[in-house]
Design a protein with these regions (language model features):
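Short coil-to-beta microelement around the adenine-binding A-loop and adjacent beta1/P-loop entry
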Residues: 39-41, 103
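ABC-type ATPase nucleotide-binding domains, specifically the catalytic core motifs of the NBD
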Residues: 37-38, 56, 77-80, 124-142, ...
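Short beta-strand immediately N-terminal to the Walker A/P-loop
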Residues: 56-57, 111
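The feature captures the beta-strand-to-loop junction immediately N-terminal to the Walker
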Residues: 59-64
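Conserved ABC transporter NBD signature motif
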Residues: 84-94, 107, 140-146
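Helix-to-loop junction immediately C-terminal to a conserved catalytic motif
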Residues: 74
Length: 157
């Protein structure tokens, strides 16, 4: 079960960490239903709003629907024969459910898989090369260029 956790204290009236959060949602998931293999209902009636500037975490037990929710938002359900069959997902005023995952990533939405740790003492480039040790150098160089094109700040790390 996924539930939205609301803070127990109101943000400070004089500004503070939450002062820059805009009240209008940047991401809105509205009453979605997700089905796998056309018959397995995984999520039903899930709704949540993510305000601009907010940091949100989905917490729950194994099988609660966290990964499925993130796959629905990032457009990756099709890779596992899943689909949003009801409701809608809106990002910055535009519907994105059922859309192209590449376009979704270009909007700045992506899923970070759990349990994938980088080696902190290595640069981003060294971590990328480490994960590609079985591939040819030309392929790796091309793919690393593409990663840096999508995420230019990684070059700095």
């Amino acid at each position: 079960m996924i539930q939205q956790v609301k803070p127990s204290l109101d943000p400070p009236a004089n500004g503070g960490a939450n002062a820059s959060i805009d009240a209008s949602p940047l991401l809105s998931v509205r009453n979605i239903e997700v089905v796998y293999d056309e018959v397995i209902l995984v999520l039903r009636g899930l709704s949540l709003d993510v305000p601009r500037g907010a940091v949100v975490a989905l917490l729950g037990a194994n099988g609660a629907g966290k990964s499925t929710t993130l796959k629905a938002i990032s457009g990756l359900l099709k890779t596992e024969n899943g689909e949003v069959t009801r409701g809608e997902i809106v990002f910055d005023g535009e519907r994105i459910d059922g859309g192209d995952p590449v376009r979704t990533v270009r909007r700045g939405i992506s899923q970070v898989m759990e349990g994938r740790r980088i080696i902190a003492d290595l640069t981003a480039l060294e971590n990328l090369r480490l994960g590609a040790f079985t591939r040819r150098d030309k392929e790796v160089a091309r793919d690393i260029e593409m990663v840096f094109a999508y995420f230019p700040r990684l070059k700095e790390r």
